[in-house]
Amino acid sequence: HRDFHVSNMMFYKNKIALIDSQDAVLGNPAYDLASLIDDVRIKTSNSFKSNILKVFLSKFKYKNESQFINDFEILSVLRNLKIIGIFTRLAKRDKKRKYLKLIPYAWKLIDNRIKNNPNFHDLKNFLQKNPRIKKI
C-alpha cells in the first residue's frame, strides 16, 4: 500500500476501510505493518508495539517468522530514515517546519529497531560516528 497508517483507516459498517489508496502497490506485507506499528506521528510503548506484532503473527502464519520479523525491522528503519529526509526537505525547501518536531521520535524508532538486530551492525556504527539531523 505504501501509505498505510492509522490516518488512512476508518471504521465503516463494523469493518476497517482503507482510504487514500490511489498510490497502492503490491509489496512486502511487512512494510504496511511497519507503517502501522512504527508510525512517527503516534507514540506508543515498545510493549504495545510488540503485542501488535505478536497478534499479527498469530493471525497470519508465515513459514519463516524470523525472516518476516527481520524484513519488518529493515523496512521500519528504511521508512523512518526516508521520513527524516522528507521532513527535512519540507522544512528547508517548503518552509514547513511543523514536521521537524517528529524527527527525534523517528530516530527513537530507528534506534529501537537496530539495537538488537545484528544485520544493523554497520548502520549502528555509522550512526554512532556521524551526527544526526537535530536542528534545521
For each of these PLM feature ranges, what is it?
Residues 21, 37-40, 72:
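Conserved short-loop catalytic and cofactor-binding motifs
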Residues 29-63, 77-94, 106-113:
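Active-site activation/catalytic loop segments of kinase-like enzymes and analogous catalytic loops
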Residues 65-76:
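All-alpha amphipathic helical-bundle segments outside canonical DNA-binding/catalytic cores
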